[in-house]
UniProtKB/Swiss-Prot annotation:
The gene is rpoA. It comes from the Eukaryota. GO terms for cellular component: chloroplast; DNA-directed RNA polymerase complex; mitochondrion. This is DNA-directed RNA polymerase subunit alpha. Gene3D superfamilies: 5' to 3' exonuclease, C-terminal subdomain, DNA-directed RNA polymerase, insert domain, RNA polymerase, RBP11-like subunit. Residues 267-334 are annotated as: Alpha C-terminal domain (alpha-CTD). Residues 1-232 are annotated as: Alpha N-terminal domain (alpha-NTD). Belongs to the RNA polymerase alpha chain family. Its EC number is 2.7.7.6. Transmembrane segments: none annotated. GO terms for biological process: DNA-templated transcription. InterPro entries: DNA-dir_RNA_pol_insert (IPR011262), DNA-dir_RNA_pol_RpoA/D/Rpb3 (IPR011263), DNA-dir_RpoA (IPR011773), RBP11-like (IPR036603), RNAP_asu_C (IPR011260), RNApol_insert_sf (IPR036643). DNA-dependent RNA polymerase catalyzes the transcription of DNA into RNA using the four ribonucleoside triphosphates as substrates. It catalyses: RNA(n) + a ribonucleoside 5'-triphosphate = RNA(n+1) + diphosphate.
């Protein structure tokens, strides 16, 4: 039995990475801890995070391949060692990283003899994680030309019936960048109180690091709960319809009124850190510009001057005016 000594916070809730390694280009591992937690909280967070990590994080895959003069998926071509089916399976395994929206086109044009690998794919705005991934072996001086379709989604999608008429074949797509996630709980006694430490293990395919996956999962989870903080006031009617009560609307401003003055600035920053630019409903082009500049939250956006924003590639004066207008509308955040 292996024993580890870990220094954990006993007062303020904190998380940290206690182990990180790269087993291969397509296998990253990270182990994280979160503490201190009250009894029962670790299991709640662990189960929720595992479900989000495995099902809610987007990934990029090749979803369709097209090549002319192919009668069916299980046919072979003279001069190519693999069958068409084997080539499609190899394309399915290609790991990609991107921030694209919608569908993109890519292609392979290779003249044999030689080995076709992932580095031979012409991919606009998409990164291949492992250029050495094998696709096909051309044993004769022939041309192999394949048109590819690339998509970014979440979860997985089983291929539909192939359209044989135009030589187009759908590919089973696994969009999940997280290969696996596990959690475990360690209980300990702090004074007279029983507390817990949550251990979270994450394996990814290399398109995201475990830390990036944890960040994305946390952001997605926050987005799911944000509407509850801004729910409209509702009247609760009792069965006798004689007594009515209105639930007060919780806002960040209401909360700030009850904290000490010296904590207001910190509270405001914490709030802004939890509000992501995804929630501002920005046009895709502005959103992509901010993302490429590593601006993910409203706090990070407010920390940028107008001059900083105008230095962003493809960012225009009209975009700046639009953002300023959005922030003015959302003034309860700032």
């Amino acid at each position: 039995m292996i024993r580890e000594k870990l220094k954990v916070s006993t007062q303020t809730l904190q998380w940290k990475c206690v182990e990180s390694r790269v087993d291969s280009k397509r296998l990253y591992y990270g182990r994280f801890i979160l503490s201190p937690l009250m009894k029962g909280q670790a299991d709640t967070i662990g189960i929720t995070m595992r479900r989000i990590l495995l099902g809610e994080i987007e990934g990029t895959c090749i979803t369709r391949a097209k090549s002319e003069k192919i009668p069916h998926e299980y046919s072979t071509i003279v001069g190519i060692q693999e069958s068409i089916h084997e080539i499609l399976m190899n394309l399915k395994e290609i790991v990609l990283r991107s921030n694209l929206y919608g569908t993109r086109e890519a292609s392979i044009c290779f003249k044999g003899p030689g080995y076709v690998t992932a580095q031979d794919i012409i991919l606009p705005s998409v990164e291949v994680i492992d250029n050495t991934q094998h696709i096909a072996n051309l044993t004769e001086p022939i041309n192999l030309c394949i048109e590819l379709q690339i998509e970014r989604k979440r979860g997985y999608r089983i291929k539909t019936l192939n359209n044989i008429q135009d030589g187009s074949y759908t590919i089973d797509a696994v969009f999940m960048p997280v290969r696996n996630a596990n959690h475990s709980i360690h209980s300990y006694v702090n004074g007279n109180q029983k507390q817990e430490i949550l251990f979270l293990e994450i394996w990814t395919n290399g398109s995201l690091t475990p830390k990036e996956a944890l960040y994305e999962a946390s952001r997605n989870l926050i987005d799911l709960f944000i509407p509850f903080l801004h729910a409209e006031e509702e009247n609760l009617n009792f069965e006798n319809n004689q007594h009515k009560m209105t639930l007060p609307l919780f806002t960040f401003h209401d909360h700030d009124r009850f904290v000490k003055d010296k904590l207001r600035k910190n509270q405001k920053e914490i709030t802004l850190k939890s509000i992501f630019i995804d929630q501002l409903e920005l046009p895709p082009r502005i959103y992509n510009c901010l993302k490429k500049s590593n601006i993910h939250t409203v706090l990070e956006l407010l920390n940028k001057s107008q001059e900083d924003l105008m230095k962003i590639e493809h960012f225009r004066v009209e975009d700046l005016k639009f953002i300023l207008n959005i922030l003015q509308i959302e003034n309860h955040f700032v």
